[in-house]
């Protein structure tokens, strides 16, 4: 049986609508990662700092990014889901980030079937304080691991869509195109 990473499609209408496989629900300190070679989730670690993920966090299947991992996605949803949940989301922006010297940008997306966030159409519609919370989390969550991360700011929807297209192309170059 194949990993969800390879078996779940990118989405119904990429890059405007993509699937996300949730790895870490909002409010968790446990870092899960989807296994790439078999179906399942691996527990990577418990965060060293007393912080929790401020959003549901996961990946777009059948993507590959500069850091060698799938494209990361932060999902705006009013209730936490669970590791392994798959949802269709709409990208609205991107947080530019460097993790230990490697580009590790993260897509910000909205779960449209949640009336608490479905009105969000663009990065400018997101509460500025929430964007600050997200950036602060990713700036500090690895400090006690003695690892350096740096948030470089936010970019809009067009930049996010282009980055998703790049990550799809990188996946196809490595693994081949799948139906």
UniProtKB/Swiss-Prot annotation:
Cofactor: Mg(2+)
Entry EC number(s): 3.6.1.1
GO molecular function: inorganic diphosphate phosphatase activity; magnesium ion binding
PANTHER family hit by this protein: INORGANIC PYROPHOSPHATASE
Protein name, entry field: Inorganic pyrophosphatase
Role noted for this protein: Catalyzes the hydrolysis of inorganic pyrophosphate (PPi) forming two phosphate ions.
Quaternary assembly: Homohexamer.
Tagged with keyword Metal-binding: yes
Cell location: Cytoplasm
Residues involved in Mg(2+) 1 binding: 67, 72, 104
Positions of substrate binding: 31, 45, 57, 141
Xref: SUPFAM superfamilies: Inorganic pyrophosphatase
Residues binding Mg(2+) 2, per UniProt: 72
């Amino acid at each position: 049986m194949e990993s969800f990473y390879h078996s779940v499609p990118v989405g119904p209408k990429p890059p405007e609508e993509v699937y996300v496989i949730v790895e870490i629900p909002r409010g968790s300190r446990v870092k899960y990662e989807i296994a790439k070679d078999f179906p399942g989730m691996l527990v990577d670690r418990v965060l060293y700092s007393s912080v929790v993920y401020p959003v549901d966090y996961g990946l777009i299947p059948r993507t590959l990014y500069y850091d060698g991992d799938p494209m990361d996605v932060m999902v705006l949803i009013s209730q936490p889901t669970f590791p392994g949940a798959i949802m269709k989301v709409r990208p609205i922006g991107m947080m530019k980030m460097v993790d230990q010297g490697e580009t590790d940008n993260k897509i910000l997306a909205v779960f449209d079937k949640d009336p608490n966030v479905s009105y969000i159409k663009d990065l400018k519609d997101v509460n500025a304080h929430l964007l600050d919370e997200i950036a602060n989390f990713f700036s500090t969550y690895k400090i006690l691991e003695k690892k350096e991360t740096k948030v470089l700011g936010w970019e809009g929807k067009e930049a996010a869509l282009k980055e998703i297209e790049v990550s799809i192309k990188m996946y196809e170059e490595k693994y081949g195109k799948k139906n």
